[in-house]
Amino acid sequence: MTIFFGNYLTQWGKSTVAKLIAGYWDVTSGSITLGGHELKDMPLSEIADQISYVSQDNYLFNRSIRENIRMGRPSATDAEVEQAAKQSGCDAFIRKLNNGYDTVVGSAGSHLSGGERQRIAIARAMLKDAPIIILDEATSSVDPENEDELQRAIEALTHDKTIIMIAHQLKTVRNADQILVLDNAHIIQRGTHAELIRQNGLYADFVSARQEAIGWKLAQ
């Protein structure tokens, strides 16, 4: 798992990197390769088959929850749809709805909360089962309890997939195989959590500041 990390208070280019990797935009210089092939030379359909992209702001169609999740893989059975929902931590809240998986979510998912919409989008990505998953602040609207559940599900996927995560929360990045620290749209540090702490750079400064902030809050 590789995580692009930056302070959420500033525009450091994390989401731009995610969209470039996903093939949403073309690079103006340099190159992005997938399996040794230039991304810009690959058919969009092939890129779409290889990559699942989950952003902070995911669109749901005015259809049932089941149909929205199944868009990840139209041939999926009901059991597979529900398994993906369990993995993403949304099965419990879905079953509490009057119509369960057949609940219509409303225009752009307006009948659901932001966190619920996000978990359904993650379930859709899990069902798609693409070899590359990009999570662009994908847990930002999820409450702490469900975020922990999502994190466990994401970790379970890493044994046979490439996970690229955009994040600014420390608990999200600590266990990553590689953390890339961005500042003003440039990668300035690279390594594991422990390696970056030893470097005493921007990442270590941020960790220290967060720990001090938590200590201050607890002392109030």
Task: Show where each model-derived region lies.
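P-loop (Walker A) phosphate-binding loop of NTP-binding proteins
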Residues: 9
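ATP-binding Walker
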Residues: 12-13
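Conserved ABC transporter NBD signature motif
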Residues: 30-37, 47
